[in-house]
Amino acid sequence: MILYTAITEQEYEQLQNNGKLYCNEKLAYMPNEYILWKIAYQFMADKLNNIDKKPDYITYPRWAWYMIDGSINLDNVNPFHYVSKPNEKTYVLKLDINKNKVLLSDFGLWHCCLNGYPIWDNENKDDAFDNFMSVCHLKYYDALVETENKNILLIKNKIMNTWDKIFNINGKNPYLYTKNKTVQAVFWEITLDVVLEKRIICLSDEEYKYSMLM
């Protein structure tokens, strides 16, 4: 499976020196910044572990792009999809990873997981569950961070069970899925043998601002 991922210059050196690169839990920005992100990242890690057993030395998977705006030809996409800040080298790697080691998901719907929201099939179900939460005087955040109350844990599980919809990358429901969707990929690590190509991008302040507007 052809994937594209962006790494820093330091990470590229680690890959060259160690022959592999995996997520450093201590440096992983999102799950360490906000507890809902940590819950979502752990959810993704657990799902990947179901199809490809996690190495003991890894906590979270690495991310890559499989499809952007409906296209899997990502050689010439907007560099904004790869570059996180200007005036810094970004190494874009084209990878070929065994599809049995990759978990694909809808990038748009993934944000529901990151923000702690359920993913329902239609507006009526959305509204009904919102009303239910209001009657319970319960916020989504409070439900997802709960660890003891059995009744709230049932609600937490109900919410997280809806997140499986992100893995239906061929879904057609217009309430959930866009026509030209973006699909992300997760896997445990990058090894030198799966790297097909390397491209270095370094955008100036002006180029970076322009890429954000494209």
Question: Regions from the language model: what does each represent?
Answer:
Residues 7-14:
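Short polar catalytic/cofactor-binding loops
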Residues 2, 10, 19-30, 58-60, ...:
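Conserved NAD+-utilizing ADP-ribose enzyme module
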Residues 14-66, 70-74:
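Glycine-rich loop/turn
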Residues 3-6, 64-65:
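Short hydrophobic-aromatic micro-motifs
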